[in-house]
Structure formats: structure tokens, C-alpha cells
Amino acid sequence: MARLNVKPTRMELSNLKNRLKTATRGHKLLKDKRDELMRRFVDLIRENNELRQTIEKELAANMKEFVLAKASENSLMVEELFAVPVHEVTLWIDIENIMSVNVPKFHVQSNTAREQEQGEFAYSYLSSNSEMDNTIQKTKELLEKLLRLAEVEKTCQLMADDIEKTRRRVNGLEYSIIPQLKETIHYIELKLEEAERASLVRIMKITS
């Protein structure tokens, strides 16, 4: 490891020792951050996989139920049921800081004035069968899970990027900066010891 190109003076030695303390402390903090990010990242990956499997199963089941419910209805009536969009959804995003990583938090609010006027469903449920009602309601309930899945996947992406950045910084300190500082400190200490011995020899010669 090449040492730093500095003058071998006591002032430089003191500066380098301070830099080494700072680098060592920073290295520990970054390692702790990296380890905690990795722990949370693994938890989120697990949640992401479980959520995706659950949503895929529920969507497949809902689709089958919808096909069966649709089969017992007149095609024109089914089109009329969904002809007018009356379900209004408001989505907003907050930012949460996790280990210095800004991640999104999705919030959703259903604003359905016509639903309140017409009843539980946002379409003419009086004209539909109970199977269709249940299928539509189950699909609506999936919205929160879908938003959570999007939130988790985006958080995983942002965390993965920050983990990689932190890993590079840790490696830079561990394998480059800290060894350079240590080697340069050792070099200056040797030079100062040599200068001190040479000075002592000169003094002894003068006094002898």
C-alpha cells in the first residue's frame, strides 16, 4: 500500500493520527449502517415475496369467481354495471427516513359519494348477483395490498442502492484509506525516531 506524500513532521503526524481516528470511527458507523440495512432489506424481501404470492393467488381466485359470476349475467347488463366510473380514489405519498434512506409511504383514501348514496358498491348492485358483488368487493380490498407491495418493492430498490454505496465506502476505508494512513504514520514515526537518534548522536559528539 503506497503511503501518503506528506512531510515527516510532528504536526503532520498529529494530523494523520486525528484523521485515522475519524476514519476508524466512520468505518465502524458505516459498517453498522450497512449491517442494519442488510437486516431490514432481508426482512423486506421476505415480506415482498409473501405479499406477491398472496396477491397473485387472490387475483387468480377473484378472476375465476368473476368469470363464474359473469356467466350467470347478461353480457349487456355486465357492461352496464361497469359503464360509469363512480369510485374515486385519492393517493398520496409521504417520505420516511430509514437509516438515512428516504423511502415512500403510500396512503389511499376512497372518496365515493355515489357509493354512499347507492349503497356499499360503486355500481348498480341491485341489478347484479351476489357472486358479482362479492368478487368486486374482494378485488377492491386488494388495493391496500397492491400499494403495500409497490411500497415494499420501491423501498427494496432504494435500500439496495444505498447498501451498495455504503459497501463501497466501507471497502474504501478498510482497504485503502485506513491502511494508507497507518503506513504513513508508521513511516513518519520512523523518520522522527531516526532524526531524534541523529540529533542525540550529534549532542553526544559535541559534549564528548
Swiss-Prot record:
GO terms for biological process: proton motive force-driven plasma membrane ATP synthesis. One of its GO terms (molecular function) is ATP binding. InterPro entries: V_ATPase_D (IPR002699). Keywords: ATP synthesis, Hydrogen ion transport, Ion transport, Transport. Gene3D superfamilies: 1.10.287.3240. Produces ATP from ADP in the presence of a proton gradient across the membrane. Belongs to the V-ATPase D subunit family. HAMAP family: ATP_synth_D_arch. PANTHER family: V-TYPE ATP SYNTHASE SUBUNIT D (PTHR11671). This is V-type ATP synthase subunit D. It comes from Streptococcus pyogenes serotype M1. The gene is atpD.
